[in-house]
Design a protein with these regions (language model features):
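Hydrophobic alpha-helical transmembrane segments of multi-pass membrane transport/permease proteins
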Residues: 15-41, 49-68, 109-110, 163-173, ...
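Alpha-helical transmembrane segments of multi-pass membrane transporters/translocases
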Residues: 34-36, 201-242
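Transmembrane helix segments
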Residues: 34-41, 152-193, 197
Length: 242
């Protein structure tokens, strides 16, 4: 099976899954369209509320899309498919790359849907700002992709929904996806150590300085550099490649 064929197969699996359709696409889109019309003229985090909440809901849906490959990995493990792959011509690297690319493709679809809704509800950015915000969001998803792969190879298929749900919802909530919980003090300092904070605030970063400050890049990089080796170790342990 060629790499592109396997990516296509994984993408179809993702898009046929009702959890992906609901959590990555429907939920953030519906919440955005319900909340924003009544708050079109509000200001949050120094930017128009429609822009802030568009970025927040796009980040929330994209987090689900990024971590979702873990669910497919867990299902494959429960059926013995992960170990069976070792005796097929499909290389392990191809399998992992397909999962990662699928995560990002689903995330891009989420961003496109929320961008369209935002534009229809008054969000106005120039082309460079749209691209810059998209770039920040995709970079910020790296820890979630790694977390999904790690959880998929470690947690049982029955326990995985709770594990993934707790991880995404907690980080999204603390990061400000459903409204800023902390605007000052020690708690704000703590939540700035989460990658979800910088995902949610990608819009205000683009409108302000055009990018995250150094602190944001460091936080996302540290999370990615910590979770990626864990994902690799989980995969090797699960498949017997130790």
């Amino acid at each position: 099976m060629k790499g592109t064929t396997h990516v296509h197969y994984e993408l179809l699996r993702a898009l046929r899954n009702w959890r992906t359709l609901f959590l990555s696409f429907a939920l953030p889109l519906v919440v955005y369209c319900l909340i924003v019309p009544e708050n079109r003229h509000a200001v949050t985090d120094g930017i128009p509320f429609p822009l802030y909440f568009m970025t927040a809901m796009a980040a929330y849906g994209a987090m689900w899309g990024a971590i979702n490959p873990g669910a497919r990995i867990a299902r494959d493990r429960s059926k013995g498919w992960v170990r069976a792959l070792r005796i097929t011509p499909l290389r392990a690297r191809t399998e992992i790359v397909a999962k990662v690319l699928t995560a990002y493709l689903v995330a891009l679809l989420t961003l496109a849907l929320l961008y369209l809704a935002g534009a229809l509800l008054g969000v106005r950015l120039d082309a460079a700002q749209w691209f810059e915000m998209t770039g920040l969001l995709l970079v910020g998803l790296a820890p979630f992709v790694a977390a999904g792969i790690a959880l998929g190879h470690v947690v049982s298929v029955d326990a995985l929904p709770a594990a993934m749900g707790g991880f995404v919802v907690l980080l999204a909530l603390l990061g400000g996806a459903f409204g800023q919980l902390f605007s000052r003090g020690a708690m704000l300092t703590i939540v700035k150590l989460l990658p979800s904070y910088w995902l949610v605030h990608a819009g205000s970063s683009v409108v302000g300085s055009g990018s995250w400050p150094a602190e944001g890049w460091i936080v996302v990089a540290v999370w990615a550099l910590c979770l990626t080796p864990l994902a690799v170790l989980a995969y090797r342990h699960d498949t017997g490649e130790v």
